[in-house]
Amino acid sequence: MIQYDKIFIDGRWVPASSGEFSTLVNPATEEPFARVPSAFPADVDAAVQAARRAFGPWSRSTAAERKELIDAICARLTERSDELASLISQEMGIPVHFAKGIQVNGPIQGLSIFGNLAHTMEEEREENGYLVVREPIGVCAFITPWNFPLFQVIAKVGPALASGCTSVLKPSEQTPLSCFVFAEVCAQVGLPAGVFNLVTGKGSVIGEALSSHPEVDMVSFTGSTEVGVEIARAAAGGVKRVCQELGGKSPFVVAPGANVAKAIKYVVKDSMFNSGQMCVQLSRILVHEDQYEEAVEVART
């Protein structure tokens, strides 16, 4: 069984204060295969305080320094891409080749792009008679879902690293393993202590503590609308910035006279991508009543 016994706070691997662990089950085999720590609010507080201490020096680092570290992280992640694909394959129950191509290589490429954009933080511009200067927000709390575990981490942590923000990450309790590898890599390349922190556990236990923490400046969450509402409420007390990607509906419209067979085949293929678990996945088809029967028949076959 794969075991991660500690969480990553202030550049160190430390035990969760709860002393408790959760077991991960491979959806494809329905067998337990890994265990990870279950953090408590006290761990969240320690992680946020570490991020706050690190913010000053990190926000004053140069874009070139941040890009160099991001490039080093990309290189190490690439070296461990097979390992990452294996971990994600097991925790999501998906084929290894799909995990490596979509869930690993894509996010690494994305992180490299964020590194290349670090210099934009140092650019000033005049707009309508005003001087616009970019500044890092501060301490960011990131809560990510299970369907694209590493991608969602990179999409949130990557811009934070590039812009000079520090972060505390709480990944989905179902798919946290790639996040441990990410934390290991951050330590290996010499990312300053406290710039990136990892706490794992149930959202019902530590989600509110993270979203409402007075030292957190921004909360970013991807997941259900119901949970998003609770996070917004928790963050409102501190008037934090809140950035959320919640549930959605994505219709596919087949115009009258269109090639129904071609359109429906595309819809069926697209809606099954990643087992249909995407926030922008096609979820319904709107077709003219004159072509309804044809559309249903194509979808069936």
Language model: regions and residue ranges:
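Conserved small-residue-rich beta-alpha loop and adjacent elements
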Residues: 121-194, 217, 239, 261
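A structured beta-alpha segment of the ubiquitous adenosine-cofactor-binding alpha/beta core
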Residues: 129-130, 198-217
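Short gly/ser/thr-rich secondary-structure transition/capping motifs
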Residues: 120-127, 200-201, 266-267
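Short, structured beta/alpha segment
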Residues: 1-90, 261
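ALDH superfamily catalytic-core signature
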Residues: 226-301
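Residue-level signal for inorganic ion chemistry
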Residues: 30, 66, 88, 111, ...
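Short beta->alpha connector loops at strand-helix junctions that form conserved
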Residues: 165, 170-172, 200, 222, ...
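Long amphipathic alpha-helix in the N-terminal Rossmann-like dinucleotide-binding domain
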Residues: 49, 71-82, 96-120
